[in-house]
Amino acid sequence: MPIHEIRHPLIRHKLGLMRRADISTKSFRELAQEVGALLTYEATKDLPLENYRIEGWCGPVEVEKIAGKKITVVPILRAGIGMLDGVLRLIPNAKVSVVGLSRDEETLVAHTYVEKLVGEIDQRLALIVDPMLATGGSMAATVDMLKKAGCKEIRALVLVAAPEGIRLLERTHPDVTIYTAAIDQRLNENGYIIPGLGDAGDKVFGTKQKPS
């Protein structure tokens, strides 16, 4: 399974700011969008192009455009919403599918409560966005949904990934490409990534954070 840890200086700098224990909701939200945009740049570098002609200021000119590639962005609720605006800033015409998953805090198993996929999913490149790839359960479940609906090309954009989550995706969906700002050390006994970012959903929405 291809996994790309994007070690661009801007990403490393912004991720370092996000790791601060005292970061404000506003700052975390803005940085999540910015890193999401930078990951989108990396995840779309190989999209095919085609030539076409336009009328320029000095006459006809040949330019390029993305070759008819339909894209859907798939935020995993609720934390994935924190990255969505950053992704759409670069691909504003992309359709948005929504998947809602909640994790049982004892078993760490993900349960689906929302599944709203756009039409023609079988013809689209799906970009799943979720700040944390921890156990990998939510990501694997989302990929399952997309494949069941006919989606054939899936990429995942995450801020931080744990080795445990990567291994699960390698076993269950080796054809999915992952783009991450960092591969961290491990999960703790509660399923939180170490050193991680804390609870990304709580930090995006400003709700009370659970102890890790």
UniProtKB/Swiss-Prot annotation:
Gene3D superfamilies (alphabetical): 3.40.50.2020
Binding site for uracil: 193, 198-200
Amino-acid positions noted as binding 5-phospho-alpha-D-ribose 1-diphosphate in the UniProt annotation, renumbered to this chain: 78, 103, 130-138, 199
Cofactor: Mg(2+)
Cofactor note text: Binds 1 Mg(2+) ion per subunit. The magnesium is bound as Mg-PRPP.
Listed transmembrane segments: none
Cited InterPro entries: PRibTrfase_dom, PRTase-like, Upp_B, UPRTase/APRTase, Ura_phspho_trans
Activity regulation: Allosterically activated by GTP.
Catalysed reaction, written as an equation: UMP + diphosphate = 5-phospho-alpha-D-ribose 1-diphosphate + uracil
Disulfide bonds: none
One of the GO biological process terms: uracil salvage
The entry's keywords: Allosteric enzyme, Glycosyltransferase, GTP-binding, Magnesium, Nucleotide-binding, Transferase
GO molecular function: GTP binding; magnesium ion binding; uracil phosphoribosyltransferase activity
PANTHER family named among the record's database cross-references: ADENINE PHOSPHORIBOSYLTRANSFERASE, URACIL PHOSPHORIBOSYLTRANSFERASE, CHLOROPLASTIC
Entries under NCBIfam families matching the protein: PRK00129.1, upp
Protein name: Uracil phosphoribosyltransferase
Originating species: Azotobacter vinelandii (strain DJ / ATCC BAA-1303)
